[in-house]
Swiss-Prot record:
The keyword Cytoplasm does not apply. The gene is G6PD2. Pathway: Carbohydrate degradation; pentose phosphate pathway; D-ribulose 5-phosphate from D-glucose 6-phosphate (oxidative stage): step 1/3. This is Glucose-6-phosphate 1-dehydrogenase 2, chloroplastic. It is found in: Plastid, Chloroplast stroma. It comes from the Eukaryota. It comes from Arabidopsis thaliana. Its EC number is 1.1.1.49. The modification N-acetylvaline is found at V60. The active site is at H345 (proton acceptor). It catalyses: D-glucose 6-phosphate + NADP(+) = 6-phospho-D-glucono-1,5-lactone + NADPH + H(+). D-glucose 6-phosphate binds at K253, H283, Y284, L285, G286, K287, E321, D340, K441, R446, Q482. It holds the Pfam family G6PD_N. There are 6 glucose-6-phosphate 1-dehydrogenase genes in A.thaliana. Regulated by metabolites. Post-translationally inactivated by cysteine-mediated redox modification via the ferredoxin-thioredoxin system in the light and this avoids futile cycles with photosynthetic CO2 fixation.
């Protein structure tokens, strides 16, 4: 008999139920729909009837998975009518038992456990994001947050630690301090080892105390090193998972180092979790402008017809940080910039950009189209990749360290802190269009942007008649993900006057100027999606496999041949080789032009 998963949604119910009764045909399951009367109106209530052929018995399950009634179908000449009567009787008894909830409040609770609560990610991102969701009223009415890590700490000490990183998005917002106090009262702590069944069992007992008999939905956020993912998942799954609600686990990158280790990690996780319980987080997919990418394309007629090789000459995905590893070199040296940024953040954005129109906005439909893009990509040639590493540089009397000056980095390390690559998609829409990626640390600025450079105007009338620069007859769409989120389109126009001189101007949508509301942090969106079961912005296992299949051969060749990176000064625009790579494909990096 197939297992029946409990629904995410639960509702309070009253004693007057039947407004409609509609069986749905099926061998083993039939869905029954009722309307439950409440002071707020009529609410739909879905039940599932499960028939057991061998015994002839039928069980009716509530939305929360609880059995309402068991009956023998042979005992009733009209089994559906008999079941209906039994269900109504059982629901009336249940309503009397639970008590009428005239306010319609949910009888479920969400328990969020941050595993690795004493780490930087938890302190700087996860707890502040959870507080922001609470402040905006986005968390369920009944929720509890537990920090879990090896550090010895009390509830009060956790709250003191967390309180230092909490802020309201806009200063002096009403009731900010009061909201913080309310939020911190919902935060608790349990110390334990990540591989201890006993410690997770103790956590389970504490969670149950706070859940107070409600349907328990549990979310575990693994903010821990990848080498202990599986141990923590095993313990959480076997000793602290929900017995009557859902259990979900958010896994932070890196998801392995290559195809082999990624597949092994996925296989190990699936020993204890189903695929739909695993939420692989890439926080860049939660950024506002990345989310707006699909809206921009699919809801504006002026863009969608141009979204192909016929009009687009190249696409650039640019990521830069103006700081180095600075103490995190030990972690970074094991992965490098290609694994850290390109294989996940930039490749995920590329897949969203290049995908075909999905059937719907459903998570599976979108992820299906992204996988098709990744599987259509041409293997990356090592000749189409430039790697670099920042070196020491003195500017304004200040000396900035080289990557290998970091005490946590092995001397003589060849790990790249910069990479540029040209990628191609072998399908009808994008054949021949170079997709350029560039990512680096210790560069001249901090930014992340998508640049779409359109083809030259055919015939270039103004170049022929006035001698204007050829590039003045092209357009560029820029989506600035960070900082100062914006979308702008570069167009050509005539400079006022008697002559015929062209100028480039921007049609600019600067978010801070257009919208008074501050943009939510990416972690807020992703945490809320995980709580609500929305998987659109999380990475499916076949997406991950396709991404690693693309980059693993390149990484092996670079590392096995010990390719020496091109050195560039701290605070510069990166190695010169990146410009030669772009020129090779008849492209100029958009972020180096005068007007940018």
């Amino acid at each position: 008999m197939a297992a029946l998963s409990s629904s995410v949604t639960t509702r309070s119910y009253h004693s007057g139920y039947l407004a409609s009764f509609s069986p749905v045909n099926g061998d083993r399951h039939r869905s029954l729909s009722f309307l439950s009367a409440s002071p707020q109106g009529l609410n739909p209530l879905d039940l599932c009837v499960r028939f057991q052929r061998k015994s002839g018995r039928a069980s009716v399950f509530m939305q929360d998975g609880a059995i309402v009634t068991n009956s023998n179908s042979s005992e009733s000449k009209t089994s559906l009518k008999g079941l209906k009567d039994e269900v109504l009787s059982a629901l009336s008894q249940e309503a009397a038992k639970v008590g009428v909830e005239s306010d319609g409040q949910s009888q479920s609770t969400v328990s969020i456990t941050v595993v690795g609560a004493s780490g930087d990610l938890a302190k700087k991102k996860i707890f502040p994001a959870l507080f922001a969701l609470y402040y905006e009223g986005c968390l369920p009415e009944h929720f509890t947050i537990f920090g879990y890590s090896r550090s010895k700490m009390t509830d009060v000490e956790l709250r003191n630690m967390v309180s230092k990183t909490l802020t309201c998005r806009i200063d002096k917002r009403a009731n900010c301090g009061e909201k913080m106090e309310e939020f911190l009262k919902r935060c608790f702590y349990h110390s334990g080892q990540y591989d201890s069944q006993e410690h997770f069992t103790e956590l389970d007992k504490k969670l149950k105390e706070h859940e107070a008999g409600r349907i328990s939905n549990r979310l575990f956020y693994l903010s821990i090193p990848p080498n202990i993912f599986v141990d923590a998942v095993k313990c959480a799954s076997t000793s602290a998972s929900s017995v009557n609600g859902w259990t979900r686990v958010i896994v932070e990158k890196p998801f392995g180092r290559d195809s082999e280790t990624s597949a092994a990690l996925t296989k190990s996780l699936k020993q204890y979790l189903e695929e739909d319980q695993i939420f692989r987080i890439d926080h860049y997919l939660g950024k506002e402008l990345v989310e707006n990418l699909s809206v921009l394309r699919f809801s504006n007629l002026i863009f969608e017809p141009l979204w192909s090789r016929q009009y687009i000459r190249n696409v650039q995905f640019i990521f830069s940080e103006d700081f180095g590893t600075e103490g995190r070199g030990g972690y970074f040296d094991n992965y490098g910039i290609i694994r850290d940024i390109m294989q996940n953040h930039l490749l995920q954005i590329l897949a969203l950009f290049a995908m075909e129109t999905p059937v719907s906005l459903d998570a599976e439909d979108i992820r299906n189209e992204k996988v098709k893009v990744l599987r259509s990509m041409r293997p990356i040639r090592v000749e189409d990749v430039v790697i670099g590493q920042y070196k020491s540089h003195t500017k304004g009397g200040v000396t900035y360290p080289a990557y290998t000056d970091d005490k946590t980095v092995p001397k003589g390390s060849l790990t790249p802190t910069f990479a540029a690559a040209a990628l191609f998609i072998d399908n009808a829409r994008w054949d021949g269009v170079p997709f350029l990626m560039k990512a680096g640390k210790a560069l001249h600025t901090r930014s992340a942007e998508i640049r779409v450079q359109f083809r030259h105007v055919p015939g270039n009338l103004y170049n022929r008649n006035t001698g204007s620069d050829l590039d003045q007859a092209t357009n560029e769409l820029v989506i600035r993900v960070q900082p100062d989120e914006a979308i702008y389109l570069k167009i050509n126009n005539k400079v006022p006057g008697l002559g015929m001189r062209l100028d480039r101007s921007n049609l600019n949508l600067l978010y801070s100027a257009r919208y008074s509301k501050e943009i939510p942090d990416a972690y807020e969106r992703l945490l809320l999606d995980a709580i609500e079961g929305e998987r659109r912005l999380f990475i499916r296992s076949d997406e991950l496999d396709a991404a690693w299949s693309l980059f693993t051969p390149l990484l092996k060749e670079i590392e096995e041949k010990k390719r020496i990176p091109e050195y560039y000064p701290y605070g510069s625009r990166g190695p010169v080789g990146a410009h030669y790579l772009a020129a090779k494909h008849k492209v100029q990096w958009g972020d180096v032009s005068i007007d940018q």
